[in-house]
A protein has these predicted regions:
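Adenine nucleotide phosphate-binding catalytic loops in nucleotide-utilizing enzymes
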Residues: 79-142
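Flexible active-site lid/hinge loop adjacent to a nucleotide/diphosphate
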Residues: 13-76
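Residue-level signal for functionally critical sites in structured catalytic/ligand-binding pockets
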Residues: 4-5, 13, 29, 46-48, ...
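Residues that cap or initiate secondary-structure elements
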Residues: 11, 43, 63-66, 80, ...
Length: 142
């Protein structure tokens, strides 16, 4: 399987499964069809328009205005109730899966919540935690 994360902040690399490539330039994002591709808000903004981006599963911010990105399944993250992956509480961070999502490891993930104890600024971690969740079925590093 091929997974990529465009412009992943270095501080989040510990969240990523070893098989996920940290993509640092737009050319690497467009070079092939990804099984899972994650875009940060900055990644959405820096991709040229139109971008030749294709993925089986595309994880991107719910606020990303792009319509030129192609995916079998688009999964959004953010703090909106429309986003597939969000937080149900900011005081005691709780990762919330709002709808049934396909997993790269096989099967599906049903709507549920995962506690994120001791995590400050959890909303900034949604892309990293979401990538791990879609790849492995768990938001937690093993």
């Amino acid at each position: 399987m091929d997974g990529g994360f465009f412009l992943c902040p270095d501080a989040w690399e510990f969240l990523l499964p070893a098989e996920i490539c940290h993509l640092r330039d737009a050319g690497s994002v467009c070079r092939k069809r990804w099984d899972l591709l994650t875009l940060t808000p900055m990644g959405c903004a820096l991709l040229p328009e139109p971008a030749a981006v294709t993925a089986a599963i595309l994880l991107l911010p719910g606020a990303c205005p792009r319509s030129d990105l192609r995916a079998g399944t688009v999964v959004t993250y953010g703090l909106s109730p429309r986003d597939s992956i969000t937080l149900s509480s900011l005081r005691e961070p709780m990762l919330c899966v709002q709808r049934t999502l396909p997993l790269l490891c096989g099967g599906v993930l049903e709507p549920q919540e995962f506690p994120l104890p001791g995590v400050e600024g959890a909303e900034r971690l949604l892309p990293g935690v979401g990538t791990r969740l879609l790849w492995t079925g768990s938001p937690y590093p093993l």
